[in-house]
Amino acid sequence: MEQKKLAIIATKGSLDWAYPPFILASTAAALGYEVQVFFTFYGLQLLKKKPNLEVTPLGNPGMPMPMGMDKWFPVLGLALPGMQGMMTAMMKQKMKSKGVASIEELRELCQEAEVKMIACQMTVDLFDMPKAEFIDGVEYAGAAAFFEFAGESDICLYI
């Protein structure tokens, strides 16, 4: 029987959007899938050695806020200076208290499971991102290389 394949395109660079690609990739790899994740545009932030990821409550009104913050601050209040940083700190604390793995831990788990992580070369060049900022083991390729794998995949996800 041929090994199943999962292809993921990761385009978001915020803390809340960083979890799905790594959770799904590591789970699929644990289930025996061959997995490739193609990081493009803001998703490249997830491959940085020192990611500075924040939640974006203003851009996601459906996001439940820790400790009932959504009831204290209407959507307009989330636009106040410092609110994004405060919400990020609160979300990180909540995740830690619930035992949720960090992005760095999930990313390392993916590497150990041989998930292939590909940085979009065009976007790396577009944003003048030095390769030294990225974790070891990242491959660099264009969309055409990813499509070769995605075309053979059993599941393709855009996150």
From Swiss-Prot:
Give the pathway. Energy metabolism; sulfur metabolism
Question: This protein's superkingdom?
Answer: Bacteria
Induction / repression: Up-regulated under sulfur-oxidizing conditions (at mRNA level), i.e. when grown on reduced sulfur compounds such as sulfide, thiosulfate or elemental sulfur.
Q: Which UniProt keywords apply?
A: Cell membrane, Membrane, Transmembrane, Transmembrane helix
Q: Does the keyword Transmembrane apply?
A: yes
Give the residue spans that cross the bilayer.
21-43, 72-91
Q: Which residues form the signal peptide?
A: none
Q: Where in the cell is it found?
A: Cell membrane
State what this protein does.
Sulfur carrier protein probably involved in sulfur trafficking for oxidative dissimilatory sulfur metabolism. May be a component of a cytoplasmic sulfur relay system delivering sulfur to DsrC. Binds sulfur in the presence of sulfide in vitro.
What is the protein name given in its UniProt record? Sulfur carrier protein DsrE2
Q: Which organism is it from?
A: Allochromatium vinosum (strain ATCC 17899 / DSM 180 / NBRC 103801 / NCIMB 10441 / D)
Question: Lineage of this protein's species?
Answer: Bacteria, Pseudomonadati, Pseudomonadota, Gammaproteobacteria, Chromatiales
